[in-house]
Amino acid sequence: MKNIRNIAVIAHVDHGKTTLVDGLLSQSGTFSEREKVDERVMDSNDLERERGITILSKNTAIYYKDTKINIIDTPGHADFGGEVERVLKMVDGVLLLVDAQEGVMPQTKFVVKKALSFGICPIVVVNKIDKPAAEPDRVVDEVFDLFVAMGASDKQLDFPVVYAAARDGYAMKSLDDEKKNLEPLFETILEHVPSPSGSVDEPLQMQIFTLDYDNYVGKIGIARVFNGSVKKNESVLLMKSDGSKENGRITKLIGFLGLARTEIENAYAGDIVAIAGFNAMDVGDSVVDPANPMPLDPMHLEEPTMSVYFAVNDSPLAGLEGKHVTANKLKDRLLKEMQTNIAMKCEEMGEGKFKVSGRGELQITILAENLRREGFEFSISRPEVIIKEENGVKCEPFEHLVIDTPQDFSGAIIERLGKRKAEMKAMNPMSDGYTRLEFEIPARGLIGYRSEFLTDTKGEGVMNHSFLEFRPFSGSVESRKNGALISMENGEATAFSLFNIQERGTLFINPQTKVYVGMVIGEHSRDNDLDVNPIKSKHLTNMRASGSDDAIKLTPPRTMVLERALEWIEEDEILEVTPLNLRIRKKILDPNMRKRAKK
């Protein structure tokens, strides 16, 4: 017991927490000399590596001077907030990682607030101090002010600070120390993080905080033993959060060391282990001693704030590019996702249509991107916010939005957001001619704003947002200004007709792209939809051309990635997703039927 420390790593996206965990792993001697350590070893999913973000909370364990340190890497995005809260219940200490230049970001605030409310005393790690524009002292002051604003206790305000450059593998307790290795950080963890409370002699109590799935073993629950001890093959009682009970045996008990998972025989109070043996396990369930059952408090997960409809692809080009195209395949895959992804919900809404709710656009687009890579073909509707009724009042989710932008663009941003029902809360000048703007805005107002924002700030602005609360409905929000250019023919697009269409707006397609009636091929420069023919070819004459009418110059099309396309579409459009293409189309393909439906 004395020789265990359980800590979580909290940081904003891209402040280097996964890199720091790499450094701790390699310097603690957990990897033997022979093992080659990948970079960002904790981000195991392809998308996580590509985007450099952590989506699922991971755990690993290292040994340092006979002490076992269990480290849980938490996601930094508020969209994955469901993951974060559960992790905080499992640990006794937190490393709060802050970028020495950027300071505290809004998504970190979300987690810090939770950690402080659980009474955890954080260790502040100021990372990336090797950046030329680093201002570690200012950042420490910012953290202090943030803690005060969030009502931290005196003990929490007296936090230890470690300065580090995780990439280069060194840490120091004061800025004048020698840059050697991460030892000062290990020492700080041992000194300031309490060892787990709880006793080996009490009856067994353990709580599951995240799920995993293994094709061979079935459902695996990763849990912390709060009291007592547990053996492999022991009979235990599973107490679910709704009060029901189930008897069973622990068929597998798995411990963590470095990145490896090894089967173990026993686990004691304070350990973090994985167990198998129950198919009905859920997050927040307790595993207790059948002779003396004492369940732990179930966990409260944040409610989803946004939903989209996933449906079977029914366009004219359906089934040509994907491996899995049927409703049953899609249903099985979505339900499998729900087994391990707790912050999301999925309901069947009739034949081949599923409503998936989550904590934000990012979470939903990550799911769609994963499905797409696995060879699924499907369509997605525009994201909608979830509206709740509280005491007879319609309420919608509001977000806290923080924008860092060059000063020249702040006027345009404030005007844009005003139309989207945002309320400005603060405006502070930062260094290098940047301004930080803070708003409270309905989540609906943020859908589709990111691409406008990048245009307004010429790509130099940074925006981050996190969930605030549900508030009374705020009326209608301005949506996309421009109409769509819609194909009125089936076939392959030709350069000749695209050349004539491009004066009308911005194209999304290249020549030789397959198109069908009702497919959106571009954005109109005006606010109405326009039906166009993209497959017309030039009539040949037996006159000799003068050369001037031969030169067809096409502007490169705007490439639509998943997030951008989901933000762009309106209520009457859907996004068709296949492993090879993304196509935007109207829900009603036939132009005459569409006109009738509008009336």
Swiss-Prot record:
One of its GO terms (cellular component) is ribonucleoprotein complex. InterPro entries: BipA, BipA_C, BipA_GTP-bd_dom, BipA_II, BipA_III, BipA_V, EFG_III/V, EFG_V-like. GTP binds at residues 14-19, 127-130. PROSITE patterns: G_TR_1, G_TR_2. The keyword Cell cycle does not apply. It catalyses: GTP + H2O = GDP + phosphate + H(+). One of its GO terms (molecular function) is ribosome binding. Gene3D superfamilies: 3.30.70.240, bipa protein, Elongation Factor G (Translational Gtpase), domain 3, P-loop containing nucleotide triphosphate hydrolases, Translation factors. Its main location: cytoplasm. This is Large ribosomal subunit assembly factor BipA.
